[in-house]
């Protein structure tokens, strides 16, 4: 379990995170939603160990995050950042291999090839990363994360995937494929934390939704309880857009319905 308690982070006089507390459990897909500037990526960076907050604490299985070395953290969790651009002319295989090396694999190239296949990129091994489309680059970076945590559980402890807008550059087919792979990782006992702007995908795939606004968590729980007209109006400033799919009781957001 990853637990954050009373996280506060201030930069250039601005409070980016304000007394944020979350519990992330293995076996679950946790999704953060909220408007631009809500603090979503900042919270993920604090939870993954990339940034340190001024106040509060983060623990992995009851051990304080600062107690882990970078090598230990690299073997416990993998991060797909929002920005996937690189300045150097690596091949797709070389980039994904970096994830396998960080994990300490004894066969990093083989592990990288398997991860590329899981991301639907078999045959891309020798393609130049900088010549790929934005969506293909996104999937290569997703494969790198999969190579870094190839198994949901290692030595009895859950591994974690941190995915910052993993569907941002993808077509609908690959959006669903990436999220299904993430869900499979969670189903195997791993922990997934993703940031999504597509509320319909968030509603479908999240076991726990975390709604952020103004650096605070304003709601959390199953999508059926958290995605409502009231929440959308308060957080995004539009109203009358949420419906329900009768068969599975999954909420869906239809922006056109605001014109009723």
UniProtKB/Swiss-Prot annotation:
**Predominant location:** membrane
Question: Which InterPro entries does the entry link to?
Answer: AAA+_ATPase, ABC_transporter-like_ATP-bd, ABC_transporter-like_CS, P-loop_NTPase
Topology relative to the membrane: Peripheral membrane protein
Domain called ABC transporter: residue spans? 2-239
Q: Where does the record say this protein resides? A: Cell inner membrane
Q: What does this protein do?
A: Part of the ABC transporter complex HmuTUV involved in hemin import. Responsible for energy coupling to the transport system.
| Quaternary structure annotation from Swiss-Prot or TrEMBL | The complex is composed of two ATP-binding proteins (HmuV), two transmembrane proteins (HmuU) and a solute-binding protein (HmuT).
Q: Which family does it belong to?
A: Belongs to the ABC transporter superfamily. Heme (hemin) importer (TC 3.A.1.14.5) family.
Name-wise, this protein is: Hemin import ATP-binding protein HmuV
């Amino acid at each position: 379990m990853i637990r954050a308690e009373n996280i506060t982070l201030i930069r250039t006089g601005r409070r980016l995170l304000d007394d944020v507390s979350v519990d992330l459990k293995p076996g679950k897909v946790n999704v953060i939603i909220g408007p631009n500037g809500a603090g979503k990526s900042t919270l993920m960076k604090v939870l993954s160990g990339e940034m340190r907050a001024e106040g509060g604490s983060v623990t992995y299985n009851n051990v304080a995050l600062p107690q882990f070395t970078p090598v230990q953290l690299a073997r416990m969790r993998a991060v797909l950042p929002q920005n996937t651009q690189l300045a150097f002319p690596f091949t797709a295989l070389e980039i994904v291999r970096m994830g396998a090396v960080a994990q300490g694999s004894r066969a990093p190239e083989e592990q990288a090839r398997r991860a590329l296949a899981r991301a639907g990129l078999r045959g891309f091994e020798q393609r130049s990363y900088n010549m790929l489309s934005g969506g293909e680059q996104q999937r290569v970076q997703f494969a790198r994360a999969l190579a870094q945590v190839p198994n949901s559980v290692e030595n009895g402890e859950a591994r974690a995937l941190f995915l910052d807008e993993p569907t941002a550059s993808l077509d609908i087919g690959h959006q669903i494929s990436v999220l299904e792979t993430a869900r499979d990782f969670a189903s195997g006992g791993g922990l997934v934390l993703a940031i999504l702007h597509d509320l319909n995908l968030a509603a479908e795939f999240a076991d726990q939704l975390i709604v952020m606004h103004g650096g605070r968590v304003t709601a959390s729980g199953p999508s059926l309880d958290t995605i409502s007209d009231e929440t959308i109006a308060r957080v995004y400033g539009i109203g009358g857009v949420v419906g329900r799919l009768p068969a599975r009781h999954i909420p869906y957001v239809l922006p056109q319905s605001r014109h009723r």
